[in-house]
């Protein structure tokens, strides 16, 4: 999988942008629970009062607190506040206070405020305890208190600040500040509303920021993944185009199609998720753990239980689903293979009435794929409800454990809510990672299959220092002691093949089925490389020149005509894109294709369906021959290309071909002797060996194998005339 990232080397800018946006999104997500906690703790419970450092105090309160503090703490408080005289109070926002002077807080740093909050909270608690004693000493005032107020005052009187939890001290201090604000005449409800509105606005701003970051990451991830899939398809296509028959034999056509479409699609989907989650999930997990530790470290055991439960579920899914993902890809290959075979051989299936058998084959492949898909989908379906059960169970466990802390005054309700949200973020981080982990096996299998193509060592390569063809030997083909053995085969199919095909002459190859004719001819365009010996074109070993330069010299017509979707003109121009319409028409005339082309309504602009399925076999073959002629090459290779033509068309075509292309070298593989009667040189093959070489007349007298072929195809009169011509010569 990591090998595929090398194709994104130039895309580092969007990758960096994705990472930065994910960091921003994670930071905002981790901040939201803090605001939720503040709304509950500060906005609702504390009436919008954030800490025990009041904005303003009465002079008597200030002096009372100062007397209860250590000298250093008292000095710090003195520095933090400024005394307002009565006249200054009248001109300030505290003008409603008429009873004396006020101490107003100056601007202080966050660090100094936190330190002052601790010292002032304790002083306020002590001052509250003194006030309790005064109330209890006043029997009339004490009698007016409710039972709950009396109980609270008794607790405050007897409790030492050293034994009290920080939350109790903080809440008592906040109550003191609230009473102080009321005494000054401040509107507590307005303060609370203002705090809630400001905090809510901040949360909305964060939510929009999260949304913008998430949308941007999604767009960038989708573009990067799409770019990677495009590059992979290009690389796979380029690699497959460089394959020889040897490499093609290692992959079925259906498998190559699946790898270049479905497998790359799997990689694209995984990459889209990977870019979004691979950075985000760890940030959320680590950040959530840090936040939990700062909120209440004693309750982290609840999260540990949830994480362990999730890891167990993921482990089980991995053990169960991983092998099935590998099987799934092979079954897709199998289904594609069966489908392709059925569609390709539909006419044969109907002719032999084997529709039922093919239906059973297809049903088996289809059912195997369906069963495996159902198994995988059931496993994936099991994951989400299990995860939700774990998350909901964890929430209940946290509430149960947090309730006792709240009851003991060790935790506030808002902190519990924040703890639950952080716990869910940690669990979601592991859930995201598990989703990536679950998709990874299938993507990993797909990546391995794509890499099998990309890493395939091509046997036929261009030389590092290519040579040029010799111009004085234009079109000459020479075989020197050539042996050839198919890859992984034990025996050679060609043995010590040596001959020269002179430039501008016709050399034909004939022999029984399996004698090696097509194999020999396919060595010239380097569909395979010789095992021993050498093949020279224009006096240069074909392994020493570029494959492109070699193929530029060759006009190749395969046994089975192959056409591409487009038009007749685009197919005939396939080997020479800049061919003029006159050159195209000339090629069609030589190939005896003009008549059926002119009969069509759109003539040369007539559409050709995929694989040439809308033309007959003979028409397809003539268009394939015309395509090679339009290229006007130095060397023509006809690999049994005339067998699909009727005898009359065959004769006309070869006659025109001989007249119009007499300057080119022509190599013909034939089954019919009538096709090669007038060849300048006929080479007879038998079991991979040359057993005869000469003209038709010469071989009738000297080659037994050729004689057998001739007797099976020609009449006695034809044979007699040939012998008479030979004797006369």
What are these regions (language model features)?
Residues 291-308, 314, 375-448, 453-454:
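Helix-loop-helix
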Residues 12, 245-246, 262-271, 275, ...:
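An intracellular "coupling" helix at the cytosolic face of ABC transporter transmembrane type-1 domains
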Residues 15-16, 51, 66-71, 84-97, ...:
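ABC-type nucleotide-binding domain
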Residues 11, 23-31, 204-215, 267-270, ...:
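Hydrophobic alpha-helical transmembrane bundles that constitute the permease/transmembrane domains
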Residues 1-32, 36-204, 209, 213, ...:
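Membrane-integrated ABC transporters
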Residues 44-51, 58-62, 70, 142, ...:
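Short intracellular "coupling" helices and adjacent cytoplasmic loop segments at the cytosolic face
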Residues 30, 34, 215, 219, ...:
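Membrane-embedded alpha-helical segments of multi-pass transporters/permeases
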Residues 240, 362, 450, 479-481, ...:
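Conserved catalytic Walker-motif region of ABC-type ATPase nucleotide-binding domains
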């Amino acid at each position: 999988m990591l090998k595929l990232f090398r194709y994104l080397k130039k895309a580092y800018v969007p990758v960096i942008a994705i990472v930065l946006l994910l960091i921003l999104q994670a930071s905002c997500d981790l901040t939201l629970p803090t605001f939720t906690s503040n709304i509950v703790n500060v906005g609702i419970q504390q009436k919008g009062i954030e800490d025990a450092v009041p904005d303003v105090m009465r002079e008597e309160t200030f002096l009372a607190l100062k007397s209860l503090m250590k000298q250093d703490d008292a000095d710090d408080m003195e520095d933090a506040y400024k005394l307002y005289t009565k006249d200054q109070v009248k001109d300030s926002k505290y003008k409603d206070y008429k009873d004396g002077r006020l101490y107003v807080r100056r601007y202080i740093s966050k660090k100094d405020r936190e330190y002052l909050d601790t010292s002032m909270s304790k002083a306020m608690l002590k001052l509250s305890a003194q006030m309790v004693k005064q109330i209890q000493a006043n029997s009339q005032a004490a009698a007016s208190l409710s039972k709950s107020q009396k109980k609270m005052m008794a607790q405050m009187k007897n409790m030492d600040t050293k034994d009290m939890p920080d939350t109790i001290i903080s809440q008592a201090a906040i109550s003191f500040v609230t009473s102080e604000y009321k005494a000054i005449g401040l509107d507590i409800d307005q303060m609370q509303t203002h705090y809630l509105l400001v905090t809510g606005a901040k949360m909305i701003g964060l939510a929009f920021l999260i949304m913008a970051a998430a949308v941007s990451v999604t767009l960038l991830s989708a573009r990067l993944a799409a770019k990677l899939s495009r590059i992979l398809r290009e690389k796979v296509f380029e690699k497959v185009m460089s394959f020889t028959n040897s490499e093609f034999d290692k992959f079925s056509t259906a498998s190559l199609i699946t790898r270049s479409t479905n497998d790359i699609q799997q990689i694209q989907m995984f990459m889209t998720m990977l870019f979004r989650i691979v950075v985000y999930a760890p940030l959320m997990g680590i950040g959530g753990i840090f936040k939990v530790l700062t909120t209440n470290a004693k309750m982290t055991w609840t999260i540990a239980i949830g994480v362990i439960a999730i890891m167990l579920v993921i482990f089980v899914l991995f053990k169960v689903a991983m092998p099935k993902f590998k099987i799934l890809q092979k079954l897709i290959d199998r289904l594609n293979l069966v489908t392709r075979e059925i569609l390709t051989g539909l006419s044969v299936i109907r002719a032999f009435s084997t529709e039922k058998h093919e239906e059973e084959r297809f049903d088996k492949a289809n059912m195997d794929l369906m069963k495996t898909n159902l198994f995988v989908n059931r496993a994936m379906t099991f994951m989400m409800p299990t995860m939700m059960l774990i998350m909901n169970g964890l929430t209940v466990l946290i509430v149960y454990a947090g309730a006792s802390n709240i009851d003991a005054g060790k935790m506030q309700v808002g902190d519990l809510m924040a703890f639950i949200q952080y716990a869910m973020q940690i669990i979601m981080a592991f859930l995201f990672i598990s989703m990536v982990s679950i998709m990874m096996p299938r993507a990993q299998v797909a990546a391995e299959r794509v890499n099998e193509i990309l890493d395939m060592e091509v046997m036929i390569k261009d030389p590092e220092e290519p040579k040029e063809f010799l111009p004085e030997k234009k079109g000459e083909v020479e075989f020197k002691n050539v042996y050839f053995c198919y890859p992984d085969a034990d025996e050679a199919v060609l043995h010590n093949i040596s001959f020269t095909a002179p430039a501008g002459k016709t050399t034909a190859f004939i022999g029984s089925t399996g004698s090696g004719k097509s194999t020999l001819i396919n060595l010239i365009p380097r569909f395979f490389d010789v095992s021993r010996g050498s093949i020279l074109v224009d006096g240069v070993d074909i392994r020493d020149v570029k494959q492109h330069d070699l193929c530029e010299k060759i006009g190749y017509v395969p046994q089975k005509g192959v056409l591409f979707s487009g038009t007749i003109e685009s197919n005939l121009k396939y080997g020479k894109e800049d061919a003029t319409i006159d050159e195209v028409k000339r090629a069609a005339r030589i190939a005896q294709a003009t008549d059926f082309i002119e009969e069509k309504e759109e003539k040369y602009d007539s559409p050709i369906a995929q694989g040439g399925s809308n033309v007959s076999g003979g028409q397809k073959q003539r268009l394939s021959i015309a395509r090679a002629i339009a290229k006007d090459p130095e060397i023509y290779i006809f690999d049994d290309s005339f067998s699909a033509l009727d005898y009359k068309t065959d004769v006309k075509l070869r006659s025109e071909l001989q007249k119009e292309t007499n300057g080119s070298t022509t190599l013909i593989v034939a089954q019919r002797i009538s096709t090669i009667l007038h060849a300048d040189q006929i080479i007879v093959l038998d079991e991979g060996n040359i057993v005869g070489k000469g003209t038709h007349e010469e071989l009738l007298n000297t080659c037994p194998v050729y004689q057998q072929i001739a007797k099976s195809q020609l009449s006695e009169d034809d044979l007699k005339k040939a012998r008479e011509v030979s004797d006369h010569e």
